Amino acid sequence: MDVVGRGASDWLDHKEDYGFGQYPSDAASLLALVAHEKRAGPLAKLIRRPASRSSPFIDWVGTSMGGLIGMMLAARSNSPIRRLVLNDVGPFISWQALTRLRKLHARRTERFNDLNEVQEYLRDVCAEFGPLSDEQWAHVAQHSVHASEDGGYELAWDPAILSALRIKTRDRIAFGNEFLLGFDLWPTWNAVRCPTLVLRGSRSAVLSGATARRMRKSGPRAKIIDIEGVGHAPWLMSEDQIGIIRDFLLSPDDPI
């Protein structure tokens, strides 16, 4: 899923709408559509009905913000999420980590002449994500940009997201006067009931060891696995990382 303003998704006309007031709503609509099509088959495109308690379950794998969206959805009553995988994110993010993430996103190159320049840029800003092969870097570069009108490339990411962050976080996620206390979703976490796996980069500045340990003892009592030598956030492109997720999703254990 490409969240609005990113990847192949459209950019919002009203830039102030970027934020967690919009993202979970979009994701819930997508899940309802997917569940409906799985339930109704070929007729789904002709008959639109809201998802019900009998909707098929869906597994959610989310990195960073995608994990927060998944957590918010999994905390809802009658959530269709069967199993939840959070990649290097938890219900608490310190203000230092938030500031660091904002600065990282602000290191934005407006235009690239070719995909080699895209790769060079990504190898720099994404270095702590972990090692990739040349072929994987080429794949990441190709899917991180779109062609610009002048024949070059631009990041597939609306720069207005950063300017909207200050407004949205203050008004909707309590990053105003409470900013110094960090981003706190512990009540949401404690409402999650589905089996949950958390992958944590051992060098992560976003998901601290203390937060991960608390996640193991509260809410869905997540299974925590550290990915050694990696910061925020593991690529989930290596065979071992993919295998960890596959084994969790295919586990015969019944959901909580």
Where are each of the predicted segments found?
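Short beta-to-alpha linker loops that shape the active-site pocket of alpha/beta-hydrolase fold enzymes
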Residues: 2-6, 90, 228-231
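Conserved hydrolase catalytic core segment
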Residues: 53-97
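Active-site loop/oxyanion-hole signature of alpha/beta-hydrolase fold enzymes
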Residues: 3-61, 244
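A catalytic-pocket lid/entrance helix-loop region that shapes and gates access to the active site
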Residues: 89-117
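Conserved serine/cysteine hydrolase catalytic core
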Residues: 146-214
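Conserved catalytic-core motifs of eukaryotic protein kinase domains, centered on the activation segment
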Residues: 9-16, 96-97, 209-210, 237
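Catalytic histidine-centered segment of alpha/beta-hydrolase-like enzymes
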Residues: 230-239
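Conserved alpha/beta-hydrolase catalytic His-Asp/Glu region
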Residues: 113-170
